[in-house]
């Protein structure tokens, strides 16, 4: 085989090549930094899929400085027909909600993405506070003694809440937006917003928070819907619609705080 020597680049040429590569690298870093900044500036939503497989019956204070205590967390209710656990359904919808929100340009922080966790309601609120999230969505299913009870509702603190009064008004607005759009998407009965100061996961929150009770697992028809993949997707989109409406009312965009 005949070898052919290629002329080596001159010192000037090597210097020019190095400059070009350095400039290209700097441009790439600048683009990466800008994309990273845009990502950080997006509104961040914390999602807490309510309950878990392992019940934690130890007591914890329902709010900062409170003498009143409640069990840390339960496994939730169970479907009257499906016999499926609430914690399973909550997580399924929460994961769909995560995808729906990301598709709309939000950042998402998940409190849990598996059923095998040991997280009290207080801990979940603290995790959301520390995550840098802007709002907290707590996803739950409802239950009642009567099988005829049906529909969706949201929960927020009262305006006189002794633990998180500073976020009460915003939490109520968020709750109103979410329950309205969820019911519009799904056709579920709108049971409105329930105001309460007894929920640990609300009282320890420092960011606007709502508990979303998606439907009654004690109602035969609603129980089956809550485990239906298509219906779960409608719930997720409905909640995401509510988040959009909440920020539209505040004059804020998805991609920036």
What are these regions (language model features)?
Residues 1-257:
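Catalytic-site microenvironment of enzymes
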